Amino acid sequence: MHNLIKDLKARNLINNITNEEKLKKALAENKGIYVGFDPSADSLHLGNYIMIMLLKRFRLHNIKTFALVGGATGMIGDPSGKSAERNLLDKTILEHNITKIKYQLEKFTNSQVINNYDFYKNMTFLDFLRDVGKLININYLLEKEIISSRLDVGISYTEFSYNLLQGYDFLQLYKNDNIAIQAGGSDQWGNITTGIEIIRKSLGDDNIACGLTINLLTNSEGKKFGKSEKGAIYLDENKSSVYEMYQFLINQTDADVEKLLNFLTLIDVDEINKIMQAHKENPALRIAQKALAQAVVVDVHGQQKYEQALHISQVLFNGNINELNQEEFNIAIKSLPTTKLDKDEIKIIDLLNLANISSSNRVARDFLSTGSILVNDIKVNDENFLVKKQDAINQEFSIIKKGKRNYFLIVWNKD
């Protein structure tokens, strides 16, 4: 067995393989592999990162890797895993998303990026029906879970056709780009096998087209990985700060962290086992979570940004916020729960309730009496203490700290 496949299995990444013998042959003959990415947003997120890492793993084994951006399929929307019709993207937005995602894929995977719109821009509807539609039987499509699961609630002809488009993509890549392997999440099995069937119908049984699916990355509660309470953690630091990504990863549960180390990092499996052993001996040190956060943040944003996120975290949880420089302060406050005020002063007890730091006056008094509340790093015990705009940082921000680790941002209205 190819060492790469052994590694993928050891990490429990592989969900299914269409034909393992064809996969071995494709790897032996130096055929390429591709993964499709949906341009539904203008940045990829941590949920996509497992497939980015898959391409990196293949590339490290000197296998040609390709990333396909759905310039055509993105106009329709993949029905896989959806219970209702997706909203269609405006063409201008779609083109913007494609440009941004193409840049990210080239940066993170060093793969050739292909836009599948190029396959269809000169094809008429009649061409598609004649050259693609005739290859696949309706009954074949109705047996697909992505189709059958939507029959009761309804599926448009647009989304019904998506399976054929993704399948035709594989045929074009197989014929023209020496690509024999398609990979995707486990929800892509139906689309991948349709592509293999289209190749078989077009080129005969001697083809070596094959597919492999990767286990979906879910947490111990069965929820898809990659979203915080505020939403997706994006790879674009203008949409999600490096600090937010670091915090999201460092706060993963003990139940999830070993899987995440295997799925999202290039750390050797034996080394991951050693990390987990050390972690289990003293879970409070969060050795595994620290290894995960460092590996992913350095890979996505670089060592310097990782060190900056680490410093912000250390200051917020162990030190004085005044230790942050201006850039670090601006990054930190973007991630904090925020309350806006259009007055010049407010009693601390009222502010604690207004900002949802406390649930009642009684709880607020408890926080104050036990010394749990700091305003701009000054401890406050008096419930009548006035928090004033004139004392705010740059007369714009006040930072409320509750306990050791909970920060809240107060934004004063500018005159």
Curated annotation (Swiss-Prot):
Pfam families, per this entry?
A: SYY_C-terminal (PF22421), tRNA-synt_1b (PF00579)
Q: Motif ('HIGH' region) spans which residues?
A: 39-48
* Source species, domain of life: Bacteria
Q: Name one GO biological process term.
A: tyrosyl-tRNA aminoacylation
Instruction: Give the motif span ('KMSKS' region).
Output: 224-228
GO CC annotation terms, alphabetical: cytosol
Name the residues that bind L-tyrosine. 34, 162, 166
* Keywords from the named record: Aminoacyl-tRNA synthetase, ATP-binding, Cytoplasm, Ligase, Nucleotide-binding, Protein biosynthesis, RNA-binding
Q: Does the keyword Translocase apply?
A: no
* CDD domains documented for this protein: TyrRS_core (cd00805)
UniProt-listed Enzyme Commission number(s): 6.1.1.1
Which molecular-function annotation in GO is an example for this chain? RNA binding
The primary location reported for this protein is cytoplasm
Indicate where this protein resides in the cell.
Answer: Cytoplasm
Name the enzyme's class.
ligase
Xref: Gene3D superfamilies? HUPs, RNA-binding S4 domain, Tyrosyl-Transfer RNA Synthetase
Q: Where is the S4 RNA-binding domain?
A: 346-413
Tell me what reaction this enzyme catalyses: tRNA(Tyr) + L-tyrosine + ATP = L-tyrosyl-tRNA(Tyr) + AMP + diphosphate + H(+)
Q: Which family does it belong to?
A: Belongs to the class-I aminoacyl-tRNA synthetase family. TyrS type 1 subfamily.
Its function?
A: Catalyzes the attachment of tyrosine to tRNA(Tyr) in a two-step reaction: tyrosine is first activated by ATP to form Tyr-AMP and then transferred to the acceptor end of tRNA(Tyr).
Q: How does it assemble?
A: Homodimer.
The name this protein carries in UniProt is: Tyrosine--tRNA ligase
Taxonomic source organism: Ureaplasma urealyticum serovar 10 (strain ATCC 33699 / Western)
Record gene name:
tyrS
